[in-house]
Regions:
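Short, solvent-exposed loop/turn segments at secondary-structure junctions
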Residues: 45-46, 68-70, 91, 116-118, ...
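Active-site phosphate-binding strand-loop segment of PLP-dependent enzymes
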Residues: 91-189, 197, 369
Length: 401
């Protein structure tokens, strides 16, 4: 079932001219890569290359938070390093004592996350700890479009940083690997994007932007797909190396076939011409309005009740007191709520981390993206009120999974 038929509105932003500028302004957010950064298809690919840039080997361990999407763990395993999980508290802060316990003789790096676009609560302590224990710091900014902490922009505190722009923009793919320290040598030989791939992306975007014309351009779509398949089959690299990642892909596995895929031309163009300030302003405004309304609902607890200046939220994360897997109830009612219960890393079974288990089972995320209008926010609040009312008489901690 398509997203438009299942939900009352989209989980992710769709393409619109409203947030485009005619020319790419100088100095805007994330408009160009540099000698110390690379534009890639996926953030998980950036994590893989980050390990190589930092000189890790297959004998090294990477400390990883126990609350994380499996897509961020798979590249560590694929690289050959060993992920070692550390505890996360219910407010998404790091269990610093558990980190200390997990630093063994093979520990080489520590990965931390700026959850949902908000500065990590322990960033200074983690930086100091890594400096003290001679660990490399990997800053996962996959939920970040912009923001700072103590005057330092997010993405500049780790030895490397990883961004995922397709979480914020209506693009096919798009991620960045940023190096903040000198390395002996770093070269990523990305494949050139075939014209047929660019054409296919353009057709997909047109179908997304104007669904009624899908039937009219179906012949063009079929031609684009045929040419792309033919190009892949004729390539010396083989079809597996011509694989693509499309916007909205929920796969968490690490696919070597797309490892050397660049950020697409169309994605780069949209990103360069997007009015980032307008996107940030709309997302912040939606967050403020939604948070104000949710404050009035008994039993609803937001992970971040306040939105700091300069932060661009990815989503609005929250829990229902005493009720697990609420996102499933909301999705049944047409609200595209999301949770990480289905993307928990395979190693995290058996109640090893109780607070992380709570987050996987109880924390869910509401969209606040730039395409949402006031009536969409009102719809979310109305459904949440109804769900809260209908579950108020149920036993506490009821499991809906």
């Amino acid at each position: 079932m398509s997203q438009s038929r299942q939900f009352k509105f989209g989980k992710d932003p769709s393409f619109t001219f409203k947030f485009l500028r005619r020319s790419a302004p100088n100095g805007s957010l994330h408009t160009s890569a540099s000698a110390s950064s690379w534009w890639l298809a996926l953030a998980r690919n950036a994590i893989y290359f980050a390990l190589g840039a930092l000189g890790l080997t297959s004998e090294d361990e990477v400390l990883v938070p126990a609350y994380i999407c499996a897509a961020a763990v798979e590249p560590i395993r694929a690289y050959g390093a060993k992920p070692v999980f550390y505890g996360i508290n219910k407010d998404c802060s790091a269990d610093l004592l558990d980190i200390e316990r997990k630093i063994g003789p093979c520990a080489r790096a520590l990965l931390f996350v700026h959850y949902f676009g908000f500065p990590n609560r322990n960033i200074r302590e983690l930086r100091s700890l890594c400096d003290l224990r001679n660990l490399l710091l990997i800053e996962d900014c996959a939920h970040v479009l912009c923001g700072e902490t103590d005057g330092v922009p997010l993405g500049q505190l780790g030895d490397v940083a990883v961004f995922s722009f397709r979480k914020f923009l209506p693009i096919i793919n798009g991620a960045e690997l940023r190096l903040n320290r000198q390395v002996e040598s770093m070269s990523i030989k990305l494949r050139r994007e075939a014209f047929t791939s660019t054409l296919k992306h353009a057709v997909n975007l047109a179908e997304q932007r104007w669904p009624p014309i899908s039937s009219a351009i179906k012949p063009l779509s079929n031609v684009a797909k045929f040419l792309h398949r033919a190009s892949s089959q004729q390539s010396q690299e083989g079809p597996a190396q011509q694989a693509e990642v499309l916007h909205g892909n929920s796969e968490t596995r690490f696919d070597p076939g797309v490892l050397y895929s660049p950020m697409s031309r169309l994605s780069r163009w949209i990103m360069a011409h997007t009015d980032m300030e307008a996107v940030v302003e709309r997302r912040r405004d939606n967050y403020f309005k939604l948070a104000d309304a949710l404050h009035e609902i008994s039993g609803v607890e937001m992970l971040f009740p306040k939105l700091p200046a300069g932060v661009c939220p990815w989503t609005l994360p929250l829990t229902f007191e005493g009720l697990s897997y609420v996102h499933k109830l909301l999705r049944e009612r047409g609200i595209p709520a999301v949770a990480w219960d289905a993307v928990r890393p395979q190693e995290l079974g058996g109640a090893q981390f109780h607070d992380a288990d709570f987050l996987y089972e109880n924390l869910f995320f509401l969209p606040v993206h730039q395409n949402l209008e006031p009536h969409h926010l009102d719809e979310m609040v109305s459904v949440i009120k109804n769900v809260r009312h209908s579950t108020r008489s149920r036993p506490l901690a009821r499991n809906l999974g």
